[in-house]
């Protein structure tokens, strides 16, 4: 069963009444009864608990008068901070064991009581910016709370100071520094309240409010850190190390560090927004949803909306306020520094976005890059095209540095470019790259109506573009030049990969002809005799029976760089003689190094048949 606050209050009142009645029944008089209550530990525990209940009731009454009903976030923050304050109070009791008394406990309870109102005032002022309606009663309550808290903090600071001066160092040092820190918090809340008030009185949004709030937070955190530092030094000289102040001191240092970094990063982000982020034109706004998600208002050209590197558009003043606290996109949470390094410059992005918004992509007739070679090296051309197209949907330019727009394939695309999906790679020998089937080779004897000899599509027409648009498409900035160099490097890698695969294919499939035997039939002999005399012969050398490999390939694209790499990566075959691949001067292929009478007879028949079918040319007719 959960114990409610009402049950605890009722039980405390009943226990207190029973304790007091018992003391008066035993002693019959007022003074002996008070002495009896003060000497009994059980009676003092009941009275202490009743005092805490009375403080709680007073807090609830003042809270309902000054703040009304608390929001869920305010109640949660108050509960968390109260538990931490109670634990710190218990640690403070261990430090001041000699000063422990009823007055000491009452002072700590009063300090916790005033701290709760400071926390509520801080949360309530922060809610001003998110509240749709600010009434006059709210202003009266806040001004009353801030004035009362400032007066109480000043009074207790001065009381602790004069008590330390007259009576020497005591536990009043703790209360003096605690109320001084609370006075700094009251100053911070007052500054935020005045800034919010000034912002509410302006018909338009106040752009510099976030800057003042950030600098005010930096100043207050610096004051808090200085106060905690002085308090730790004084406590080390008077008593011992204040263990109960470690957590708030660490929080103050961390808040100061965060505020300092926010000031630096916000200034960098605002400078980047003013100098590098492009301004969105009216055509782009009309082609997209022109609602700023920060202020939920329509964006116009007069408000100078800015486009982030992730292609999201917001008001300039909204981004300025947003960058005071964090340097990410409000929509996708992308870091603006990472996006800015991979995005295009302002001029290129603006020109490409205008072309895309007008519905006229500059490269409408350009097919995808190497459509007949992409699947040979495992490049997902379709997926890449879909990704680029998705990134540019709705008139947003993609992240490519000089804004290349990829158009879908034309409807009159030749059939030789409409290839089937790439098949699965074939398993090759161990240690080699997986082999892919070669592309279909057009037949030289194809019919005129077939599409194997179709011409590729012509060059696109750029006559309808102006000089400025062509310059924007060209991309003369540093990012565009680096992108073009990278594209040429990729082309070289693709061509060299094709050369390596062709060498590997030639190495694992050597050209060998079958050795004819004496039992060959007459049909096989006639078929073999029809081979022309210009076929090159493969003359094997007296090398060991190891597989014959071709020499290291030489790249036509990189000079000596690729050749050196291939020479180091190709196994050396200098241990044995290399095979000769040059055409032989003989008119017939050499079949075997061992000759038999049957083989000589077959050879003579072939020579006679070839001479009869292909007579030598007559020099007189030339």
Swiss-Prot record:
Organism for this UniProt entry: Caenorhabditis briggsae
Topological relation to the membrane, as annotated: Multi-pass membrane protein
Homology family: Belongs to the HRD1 family.
Lumenal side, ranges: 24-41, 121-141, 192-215
Region feature Disordered, mapped onto this chain: 436-463, 514-622
Subunit description: Homodimer.
Gene that encodes it: sel-11
Protein name (database record): E3 ubiquitin-protein ligase hrd-1
Pfam family for this entry, one: zf-RING_2
